[in-house]
Amino acid sequence: MAKEKTTLPPTGAGLMRFFDEDTRAIKITPKGAVALTLILIIFEIILHVVGPRIFG
């Protein structure tokens, strides 16, 4: 009789996992990124309108 061949699940078959290690970078949620972007856009608009009066 032939031996039964056991196979491993294909989920991790030699693929690199990029998120296994914890990095020391700043972690921000997608909502936080959108909020910071909107704040930056509003700040730029305010500087564009009011800036010439303040900075000459």
From Swiss-Prot:
The keyword Protein transport applies. It is found in: Cell membrane. Residues 50-56 are extracellular. Its main location: membrane. Signal peptide: none annotated. Involved in protein export. The function of the beta subunit is unknown, but it may be involved in stabilization of the trimeric complex. NCBIfam families: PRK01253.1 (NF002318). This is Preprotein translocase subunit SecG. It comes from Pyrococcus abyssi (strain GE5 / Orsay). The gene is secG.
